[in-house]
Amino acid sequence: MMRTQCLLGLRTFVAFAAKLWSFFIYLLRRQIRTVIQYQTVRYDILPLSPVSRNRLAQVKRKILVLDLDETLIHSHHDGVLRPTVRPGTPPDFILKVVIDKHPVRFFVHKRPHVDFFLEVVSQWYELVVFTASMEIYGSAVADKLDNSRSILKRRYYRQHCTLELGSYIKDLSVVHSDLSSIVILDNSPGAYRSHPDNAIPIKSWFSDPSDTALLNLLPMLDALRFTADVRSVLSRNLHQHRLW
């Protein structure tokens, strides 16, 4: 009897210790994500020289088209048996939407440095969201990323895409007729197959907290706004190079 009680007590202690350890790991991961997301990031925006100001005045203000899923954020929803993020990783925000009369919760994770990225590029470009997701979901995500800054006002959704061979194609002429001034940032090459010379490829992001792809793009986007035609740069076999 004594032995049985000892075994039960040991099992209870082990179970409690396991739960305590899991909770500790959860808190640690959350803290690491917070530190990485909000660590001091430097990309100094220096005053333009007279020559640079003159050059920028001679070209049109460019449009930067931004994809959402796996480019700026990653999400999974209720009922996903194998979520693509590590168990216990807290989402940055949770969305509750109704799809086909059924409430669905989306757990959304922001790509590292996305807030800083949007703050910087919004000073250089007119920003446009173009996602193959449904509007009820994409609009809610864009609202969260915009965070009342009014930098993501123009938005296009699945109904603005063309479905070809099971893939959603994004026609940039829907955004603007002058393709010389449009850049699209998207993790899916199929999405911009009609406009490869306007695209900047970026690797898909799911959960890596050390990802710096958005930061790596800032120097290029800074320089690209001075061109008369973005295709003169982006057509140079960029898609054969390493992804950002």
Swiss-Prot record:
Single GO term (MF): protein serine/threonine phosphatase activity
Domain FCP1 homology, first and last residues per copy: 57-224
SUPFAM superfamilies linked to this entry: HAD-like
Keyword Cell membrane: no
Transmembrane segments: 7-29
Pfam families according to UniProt: NIF
Highest taxon listed in the record's lineage: Eukaryota
EC class (word): hydrolase
Keywords: Endoplasmic reticulum, Host-virus interaction, Hydrolase, Membrane, Nucleus, Protein phosphatase, Transmembrane, Transmembrane helix
InterPro entries to which the protein is assigned, alphabetical: Dullard_phosphatase, FCP1_dom, HAD-like_sf, HAD_sf, TIM50
CDD domains reported for this sequence: HAD_FCP1-like (cd07521)
Annotated catalysed reactions: O-phospho-L-seryl-[protein] + H2O = L-seryl-[protein] + phosphate; O-phospho-L-threonyl-[protein] + H2O = L-threonyl-[protein] + phosphate
Tissues of expression: Muscle specific with lower expression in other metabolic tissues.
Record EC number: 3.1.3.16
GO cellular component, one term: endoplasmic reticulum membrane
Gene Ontology BP terms: canonical Wnt signaling pathway; gamete generation; mesoderm development; mitotic nuclear membrane disassembly; nuclear envelope organization; positive regulation of canonical Wnt signaling pathway; positive regulation of triglyceride biosynthetic process; protein dephosphorylation
Record note on what altering residue 67 to N/E does: Abolishes phosphatase activity
Membrane topology term: Single-pass membrane protein
Keyword Transmembrane: yes
Main subcellular location: endoplasmic reticulum
Quaternary structure annotation from Swiss-Prot or TrEMBL: (Microbial infection) Interacts with Chandipura virus matrix protein. Interacts with CNEP1R1; the complex dephosphorylates LPIN1 and LPIN2.
Stored NCBIfam families: HIF-SF_euk
Similarity comment: family membership: Belongs to the dullard family.
PANTHER family registered for this protein in UniProt: DULLARD PROTEIN PHOSPHATASE
Annotated function: Serine/threonine protein phosphatase forming with CNEP1R1 an active phosphatase complex that dephosphorylates and may activate LPIN1 and LPIN2. LPIN1 and LPIN2 are phosphatidate phosphatases that catalyze the conversion of phosphatidic acid to diacylglycerol and control the metabolism of fatty acids at different levels. May indirectly modulate the lipid composition of nuclear and/or endoplasmic reticulum membranes and be required for proper nuclear membrane morphology and/or dynamics. May also indirectly regulate the production of lipid droplets and triacylglycerol.
Protein name as catalogued: CTD nuclear envelope phosphatase 1
Record gene name: CTDNEP1
